[in-house]
């Protein structure tokens, strides 16, 4: 036994070479190469550090709580503290905006810069998911960079829309919606109206028999909201059909779908969620994106 044991642990690389661990399988032996000493000390240090972390910081979950650590620190309290510090920094600039009438902010370069900076942050946090980071919009969400406004693009009108929303449940919010004509008009009539509507913006010829029939149906059913010339009515939120700017799409299939099923997009009322000063900054920011009236 002694001879066998010694033979299994004999150096395989000659004198001074690594020995085997004593195991062999199908002629394969495992060399006994110890880990470098620096690696072992590093490993031991990480174990000691881990124990220290468990003691100092929140680490272990309990039944209804967790170990808080001797330092009493946690990331949530740190975030609350950072938010509080940020609010203190913003308080001075917010106070300046709060004490100036909305229509005077853009006349003062310093206030305009403050409003745009605060409005940009608020827009990114609250508005960008729907309207896009740069306000370019998407299908069903208005582009805020152009001059096509359903409910008006003046400072006062934008502030009203942001504060009270559209079909948001707020009593002071905008309430207009596009009716569904699928049960009122025949498919042929809806197709003719779609041809006429597209002709208003030059997307289709207006002298075809279908467009001419559509014009008559439009006058009887659509002109009340969109106007006889199709230029819309901002008091009702009725779209201008002559500018070629489409919220849901200007191809015939989409227009037929809109006429058939109607539209009723919703925008939240931000008045209960944001401070008046933040809404004022948002109003200025949106107004200066490029399409403000």
Swiss-Prot record:
Cytochrome c domain segment(s): 114-201, 209-290
GO molecular function: electron transfer activity; heme binding; iron ion binding; oxidoreductase activity
Main location: membrane
Entry's transmembrane regions: 43-63
Comp. bias (Basic and acidic residues): 1-11
Gene3D superfamilies: 6.10.280.130, Cytochrome c-like domain
Keyword field: Cell inner membrane, Cell membrane, Electron transport, Heme, Hydrogen ion transport, Ion transport, Iron, Membrane, Metal-binding, Oxidoreductase, Repeat, Respiratory chain, Transmembrane, Transmembrane helix, Transport
InterPro entries: CcoP_N (IPR032858), CcoP_N_sf (IPR038414), Cyt_c-like_dom (IPR009056), Cyt_c-like_dom_sf (IPR036909), Cyt_C_IC (IPR008168), Cyt_c_oxidase_cbb3_su3 (IPR004678), Cytochrome_c_Oxidase_Subunit (IPR050597)
Cellular compartment(s): Cell inner membrane
Cofactor mode of binding and number, as noted: Binds 2 heme C groups per subunit.
Pfam family, one: Cytochrome_CBB3
Binding site for heme c 1: 127, 130-131, 267
NCBIfam families from the UniProt entry: ccoP
Assembly: Component of the cbb3-type cytochrome c oxidase at least composed of FixN, FixO, FixQ and FixP.
Membership in a protein family: Belongs to the CcoP / FixP family.
Protein name: Cbb3-type cytochrome c oxidase subunit FixP
Organism: Azorhizobium caulinodans (strain ATCC 43989 / DSM 5975 / JCM 20966 / LMG 6465 / NBRC 14845 / NCIMB 13405 / ORS 571)
């Amino acid at each position: 036994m002694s001879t066998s044991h010694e033979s299994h642990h004999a150096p395989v690389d000659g004198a001074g070479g690594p020995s085997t661990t004593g195991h062999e399988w199908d002629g394969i032996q495992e060399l006994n190469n110890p880990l470098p000493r620096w690696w072992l000390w590093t490993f031991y240090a990480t174990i000691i550090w881990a124990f220290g972390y468990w003691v100092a910081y929140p680490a272990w979950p309990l039944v209804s709580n967790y170990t808080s650590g001797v330092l009493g620190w946690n990331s949530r309290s740190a975030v609350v503290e950072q938010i509080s510090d940020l609010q203190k920094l913003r308080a001075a600039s917010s106070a300046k905006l709060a004490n100036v009438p909305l229509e005077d902010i853009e006349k003062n370069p310093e206030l305009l810069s403050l409003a745009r900076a605060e409005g940009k942050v608020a827009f990114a946090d609250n508005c960008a998911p729907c309207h896009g980071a740069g306000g370019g919009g998407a299908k069903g969400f208005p582009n805020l960079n152009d001059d096509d406004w359903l409910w008006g693009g003046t400072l006062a009108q934008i502030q009203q829309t942001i504060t009270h929303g559209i079909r948001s449940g707020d009593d002071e919010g905008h309430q207009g919606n596009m009716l569904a004509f699928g049960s009122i008009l025949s498919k042929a009539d809806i197709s003719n109206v779609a041809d006429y509507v597209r002709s208003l913006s030059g997307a289709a010829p207006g002298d075809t028999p279908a467009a001419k029939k559509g014009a008559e149906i439009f006058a009887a059913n659509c002109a009340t909201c969109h106007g006889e010339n199709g230029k819309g009515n901002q008091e009702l939120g009725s779209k201008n059909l002559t500018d070629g700017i489409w919220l849901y799409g200007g191809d015939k299939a989409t227009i037929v779908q809109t006429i058939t099923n109607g539209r009723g997009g919703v925008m939240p009322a931000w008045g209960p969620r944001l401070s008046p000063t933040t809404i004022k900054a948002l109003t200025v920011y949106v107004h200066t994106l490029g399409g403000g009236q």
